[in-house]
Amino acid sequence: GGLIIKNSSDITNIHDLKNKKVGIAGGSIDKSWLFFRAFFKKKYGMEATAFFRTSFAAPPLINGLLKTGDLDAGINYWNYNARLESQGFKSILNIEDMLPILGITGDLPLIGYVFKEELLEREYDLVKRFLQATNLSRKILEESDEEWDRIMKLTGARDKEMLITIRESFRKGIPKSEIEILNQNIIKAYDILKDIGGKKLVGEGEHLAEGTIWNAN
């Protein structure tokens, strides 16, 4: 995800957002927004909420308000930004741009699967095969343009141009770092999000609980 504006906007950088209306997808503890707040605090030494006017809404509504001009900018999820980028919008700051400033180098997985440990005891091979299948599916989507054409309706793309922006955004977001780097970055990301989101986000957890990350052998 990231910060998106109209191509015709007079906003060219973060400083131009002062007192502007910025829509945030999700709620106040959405991870993209928390990363943005952490980045803003680290780079500019201030709280983003005191710099521009924020409002929270569902991703489709953020896109709609951007199109009507009721918002000056939006922080939305990658797939919604990709749709806008084929309709006269552009991203000026993405999550991957913020992470190095926050001390995270290499890729950071932002989506994963959650399951109970007891499932591993009962169906270890099934879980392992499921993850293998998702990896193979991702590989197909990374390499095959024809597969994207086949699933176009599933993506919500209205035309070929929108499909291409969704496809390329998806491919750009596939983590390619070694598993050890990914695991380290997940732990670092937890600490960053905890410091900004506080107990409302993580409860009493000071650090990512041991065993949270599971890698199939």
Identify what each model region corresponds to.
Residues 187-217:
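Conserved C-terminal helix/tail region of periplasmic/extracytoplasmic solute-binding proteins
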Residues 82-83, 100-101, 158, 168, ...:
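Short secondary-structure capping/turn micro-motifs that flank functional sites
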Residues 2-86, 149, 183, 187:
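Bilobed "Venus flytrap"/periplasmic-binding protein-like clamshell domains
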